[in-house]
């Protein structure tokens, strides 16, 4: 079969066929070559303030602290990689649970946390979390090692936002730092920007990459 392009048409044998159709026929025979398979593995995390291990999920929860430097944040190591890598994690609200306040109808809280993922002086992403607490069913997990009933900590993750951050080639670590927290409760609203304050927690840190 011989084909000759003629403007908007192709000559296939003795028939003129619209070029779009012919291009479609060509594409049907294209073999797509996929890149080398990547790897996904748990991230190596340097956590300056560990909340603890979740009793339900088994995830390690790390506090996100307000900071002005990358060194003050949660450091996630990125293995040597070909092309861009991807760091993923779940960003949760940080709620202090009180069964008494919840029973009295005064446990409601709304959290708006603004964070940043940085590599050196470059901001790669600004993840934002909006989470609400109404009752105990809103808690994602509970953390052991506390003085509360059954040895539970009062602080627990609430809500959750799945975050994916693209990491450029040549970058071997990123830092997750807090910027601002806005909390709304039944008795008012507060905004926190003081360095060192915990404003959220992260868990389930993973790194996706292709080895060099």
Language-model features, listed with the residues they occupy:
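Extended, solvent-exposed segments with strong compositional bias
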Residues: 125-166, 183
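N-terminal secretory signal peptides that target proteins for export/translocation
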Residues: 1-14
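Noncatalytic modules at the cell exterior or secretory-pathway interfaces
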Residues: 82-87, 165-182
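Exposed low-complexity, polar/acidic, P/S/T/G-rich flexible segments that act as propeptides
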Residues: 181-212
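Bacterial N-terminal signal peptides
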Residues: 19-31
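Short coil-to-beta strand junction motifs in C2/discoidin
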Residues: 101-113
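Contiguous beta-strand segments within globular domains
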Residues: 78-103
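N-terminal leader/pro-regions and domain N-caps
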Residues: 38-68
């Amino acid at each position: 079969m011989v084909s000759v392009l003629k403007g908007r048409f192709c000559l296939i044998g003795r028939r003129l066929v619209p070029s779009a159709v012919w291009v479609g026929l060509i594409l049907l025979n294209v073999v797509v070559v996929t890149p080398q398979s990547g790897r996904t593995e748990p991230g190596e995390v340097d956590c300056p303030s560990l909340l603890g291990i979740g009793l339900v999920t088994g995830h390690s929860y790390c506090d996100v602290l307000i900071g002005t430097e990358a060194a003050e944040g949660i450091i996630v190591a990125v293995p040597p990689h070909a092309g861009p890598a991807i760091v993923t994690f779940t960003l949760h609200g940080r709620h202090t649970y009180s069964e008494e306040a919840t029973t009295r109808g005064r446990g409601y809280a709304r959290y708006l946390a603004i964070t940043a993922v940085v590599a050196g002086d470059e901001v790669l992403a600004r993840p934002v979390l909006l989470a609400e607490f109404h009752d105990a069913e809103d808690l994602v997990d509970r953390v052991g090692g506390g003085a509360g009933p059954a040895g539970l900590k009062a602080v627990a993750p609430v809500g959750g936002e799945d975050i994916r951050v693209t990491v450029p080639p040549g970058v071997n670590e990123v830092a997750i730092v807090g910027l601002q927290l806005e909390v709304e409760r039944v008795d008012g609203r507060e905004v926190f920007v003081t360095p060192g304050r915990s404003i959220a927690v992260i868990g389930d840190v993973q790194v996706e990459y292709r080895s060099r």
